[in-house]
């Protein structure tokens, strides 16, 4: 009968324990990596800077890594259209304001994202513009305690010679959650939802 060296078994168990702890730590670290602050991507909450590219760049980075939370901290962040992506939670901290910029060229139309459906071809492109846009997205959340302010941006080419962008426009999407945030000063609809749940 072959004898087992007990000291080697103890070393193996100790190594296994260290490896297990290391993997657990890596797992916890990766959870921390799923939070992205728009300020880290160049956004400024000064109420002056156009943050459209910075916010969209942050959402894109979050989405490319499998999703997570995009933090909008305290401040007033002027922006044009924000393109929502699957598995991304847009979280507005207390006293955070996402405010529509007074430049209609900065707003995208849902028609830009969804060119298949005849419904969007009937409506004028101006009618389909929004501050927050999502087409074919899943598991999107807009949460927190902040404000999304449409800033009542008027469009002379819009319906009735005044209607500007919606605050939120979602199409062909599912698993959408909106909680805690306030939607203010829409120049058209606060939320326009088509084939989305």
Q: Where do the model's predicted regions map?
A:
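Short intrinsically disordered, low-complexity coil segments enriched in acidic
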Residues: 1-2, 197
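Bacterial N-terminal signal peptides that target proteins for export
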Residues: 2-16
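Extracellular/periplasmic carbohydrate-active domains that bind, remodel
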Residues: 19-22, 27-197
């Amino acid at each position: 009968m072959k004898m087992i060296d007990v000291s080697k078994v103890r070393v193996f168990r100790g190594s296994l324990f260290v490896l297990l702890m290391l993997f657990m730590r890596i797992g916890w670290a990766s959870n921390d990596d799923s939070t992205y602050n728009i300020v880290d991507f160049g956004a400024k909450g000064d109420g002056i800077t156009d943050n459209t590219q910075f916010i969209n760049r942050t959402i894109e980075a979050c989405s490319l890594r499998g999703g997570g939370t995009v933090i909008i901290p305290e401040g007033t962040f002027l922006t044009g259209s924000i393109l929502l992506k699957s598995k991304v939670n847009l979280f507005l901290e207390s006293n955070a304001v996402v405010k529509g910029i007074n430049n209609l060229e900065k707003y995208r139309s849902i028609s830009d994202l969804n060119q298949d459906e005849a419904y969007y071809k009937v409506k004028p492109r101006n009618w389909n513009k929004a501050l927050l846009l999502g087409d074919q997205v899943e598991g999107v959340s807009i949460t927190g305690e902040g404000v999304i302010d449409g800033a009542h941006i008027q469009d002379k080419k819009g319906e009735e010679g005044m209607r500007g962008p919606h605050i939120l426009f979602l199409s062909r999407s599912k698993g959408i959650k909106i909680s805690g945030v306030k939607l203010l000063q829409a120049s058209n609809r606060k939320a326009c939802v088509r084939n989305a749940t």
